[in-house]
Amino acid sequence: MKLVLAGAAPDTGNLGVSALCHATVAEVLRIAPETEFVILDNGEGARPSAFRSTSGKACTLAGAKSSRRYWRSDCFANIRASLRIGGPGATSREIRTASAIFDISGGDSFTDLYGPRRLKAIMYPKQIALENDIPLVLLPQTYGPFASEHPRRLAATAVRGALRAYARDTYSFGVLSDLLGDAFDPRRHASGVDVAFLLPALQPAELAPAVETKLSNPAQVVAGINVSGLIYNDPVRAKSQYGIALDYPAVMRDLVTSTLDTGADAVWLIPHVMTPPGHYESDLEASRDLRAGLAPPYRERVHVLDHQYNQSEVKWVIGKCDWFCGMRMHATIAALSSGVPTAALAYSGKTMGVFASVGVEDAVVDARKESTAAASELLLERWHTRNALAQRLNARLGDVVSAARDQMSSILRAVG
């Protein structure tokens, strides 16, 4: 069986997308180790054995980019045309012989929330699969929101044509069901679990000094915080595009200082999107700016974990925290799936749905609805009630992980 994995490029700098890639490949290979994978990324051409799974199996990377350089064989528009006319491009050749296309849309990008260019890129693999009669499996993901009718129609066409379509929570399943309308079939369409719950955690070869300190002194109480560069670095855009109603940098400062004032020995600022310096999405840049603005007594107890950890290594680090708070969806999933009591400051409904899947939806604070003062107070309350939160989370976690494994087995049976 040969599978093409789309919407999970491992070279974006977004560790959440990388987590989806590695978790999907690892789980499929655990069930069906003979599977051949072709992973669509942002590179050039097809590169056999350029990717290694966590089990060490070599997989092919194949360039597939949304670009205006239509003459390039790794441009999605070129790939789409080549498949129609039997063209010779390396990526189109790999797709043509696929048993199925597994598409995960970056977990949360099957929406017009991030603009038409992102949605166009997200739609390409789905359209390619349907146009070439390649079975399309929409892995557990968020569907919507869709503010405009045209994107909604595109999405409806894709989900109706898919062999299988899974939402990653009950809230998003409602959107999926609405898109399907009378095409809904409970044998093909289901509410599932984000595959990142299955991501293996791996201890890094090199540990940050702050992490070394925690390992040598397990009694040290550490609050882990993921600061989203997407929201922190451009507050004007955050308000206009995502409806952020509060002062996000102020909430993050309040959270750091209040946790240190009420029981935390240290705060780790843990980036989950490692884009180049100056990029508006950089969590690392946001974390450094936040720490620099703190008064010295706080600053010396706050550590920016700026090591170049991969998705599994950063999950291992997050798992050493006594409590975690994040805005990046997969930073919080890394914590939840490690059994760490976790809160979230959310800018879309996707977060509530995933937290509800493990029974802790009350740990989500909506940045679109709460004031700066109210959000700060609510997050601090989640910090104080972390032990009770941990008990509820861990009572559900085993069942969620089992469900994630069962859904992949079901998908592979459907693909055959």
Regions found by a protein language model. Name each.
Residues M1-G416:
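Active-site anion-handling motifs in enzyme catalytic cores
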